Amino acid sequence: MATHKLLTLVTLVLTSALSWSPVRAETLKVDDELTVYYQVTGNGQIPIVFVPGWTMSTKVFDKQMAHFAQSTKYRFYTFDPRGQGMSTKTEGGHFYEQHGRDLHNFLSRLGLKHVVLGGWSYGGFDVLAYIREYGADNVRALIMIDAAPKSLGANNRTEWVWFSRDDADGSRRAYTMDTLLNRKKMDKNFVGWMLENPTLAKVAYLSTICDQTPGTIAALTNETGAYEDYEPDLAALEGKLPLLFSVRQDMGAPARKWAAEHTPSATVISFGKHLNFWERSDQFNAGLDRFLGTVH
């Protein structure tokens, strides 16, 4: 009896250990000039790929990494876009059409098929640029993580856009010029805007991530992003892919209005601030799980 119990306990421990996948950190040469740093976890067959936003890195998705570590259904990937985090600081290519090509190369080199694709913030432009150039045949579902489909509108408080055309709040100029002229000020303001609870420790940690992106690259990717408009590309996915728009609380009404007009089948959830998936990871991950339950 004691031997049987011991064998049962050993079996349970081994089963648990085998079902848990630690985060693996790897590098991948995706073309002649770019080597991408990426992380992966989980033991499933369905790939999920999340793309970080402007100046950010894989570190922002650490709580999603933990969430999927024991998954037997999904394998979760995230990577540092060109010029960000630990990926190559290339001389050129710092615009979103090229980011879309980089994403294509990343998926191709790893052989990832029928991907659940998510983009946070300006990372939404990465995934939409990929879909514009290569189509959506390799995409199982699309998740916009507080990512707007275009940059400019009449009013960035009432429309699902990043900037007002007149830049009345000065945000476009700040993220371009303050990045060059006063990086510490920009970091503090940017990180503070992203957080519900901007403690000194959180601001310092996230500012360190921001600063992995050189100022000239950060300024260029902010300004090139200001010209992007992927509304037609996102709208064209209606009825073709499951869509999830997870946005910060103050973008809930604009995102729902846009979805009602263009993608009525989309699931829209709103809560917290720009880093809601990091600060309120349990709430975000629960919503993500519910959405994934509808994806086949």
Please place each PLM-identified region on the residue numbering:
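Bacterial N-terminal signal peptides
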Residues: 8-19
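Active-site loop/oxyanion-hole signature of alpha/beta-hydrolase fold enzymes
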Residues: 31, 75-122, 272
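Conserved HGGG/HGGXW glycine-rich cap/lid loop of the alpha/beta-hydrolase fold
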Residues: 34, 40-89
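Conserved alpha/beta-hydrolase catalytic His-Asp/Glu region
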Residues: 153-154, 158-160, 174-236
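Post-His helix in hydrolase/transferase enzymes
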Residues: 278-293
